[in-house]
Amino acid sequence: MAFMVKTMVGGQLKNLTGSLGGGEDKGDGDKSAAEAQGMSREEYEEYQKQLVEEKMERDAQFTQRKAERATLRSHFRDKYRLPKNETDESQIQMAGGDVELPRELAKMIEEDTEEEEEKASVLGQLASLPGLNLGSLKDKAQATLGDLKQSAEKCHVM
């Protein structure tokens, strides 16, 4: 209750005394901003420095993430022989040049590469055909080889 009375009456008293004081000089803007925050000037300056450092840190992390994404895009452009993008190259250079992909992204790329290599093989193509059973095909091939060996043993020319 006392807090509400103080805020309601206190604000009005400050307005009243401020207008009666006449030519009071409020000083520079930093000092009034520091006082408004309830800090001394030194504390306020330290706070501002800390804010600037945090912003620089966030910007650096953001630039790094952008460069990682650009590296990933350029990797896929190289892989699929697509034209290069200048903005991706500039983002990589802004981050310091040699940007490594995060482990998770590198792992995903490896898995994609393995899947594509598997699909590119003859067995991968056969496995993708519908209605084809590789087990029965293997059994038939082994039976055929067995028959050929038996017929070769019976042959007198060989």
UniProtKB/Swiss-Prot annotation:
Q: Which GO terms describe its cellular component?
A: cytosol; photoreceptor ribbon synapse; presynaptic active zone membrane; SNARE complex; synaptic vesicle membrane; terminal bouton
Q: Supply one GO BP term.
A: insulin secretion
Q: How does it sit in the membrane?
A: Lipid-anchor
Domain of life here? Eukaryota
Pfam families listed in its UniProt record: Synaphin
Q: List lipidated residues, S-farnesyl cysteine.
A: 155
Cysteine methyl ester sites (modified residues) = 155
Identify the main location.
other
- Posttranslational modification, per the record? Farnesylation mediates presynaptic targeting.
Region entry Disordered, spans:
13-47, 74-99
Which residues make up the pro-peptide?
156-158
Name of this chain's protein: Complexin-3
Q: Which organism is it from?
A: Homo sapiens
* Name of encoding gene: CPLX3
